[in-house]
């Protein structure tokens, strides 16, 4: 899976949902991202803000990972305990 590799940026309202997933890396990425780890019930278990290129992050309880532009979690107030829902 390539994820965001090769992209130069994300739009302010764009993101990538990786499902299933419990960890991410930013090897070869060109920009920092916010990473939201979500459990099977849609509850946020961990938030990593401004994850720089060449880093790794994970959450054992996560079943999905949402990658967002850096600053998005602060802007829309996503924090551990927030419940998210996704529409397929």
Feature locations, PLM:
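Compact, glycine-rich, soluble single-domain proteins
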Residues: 1-88
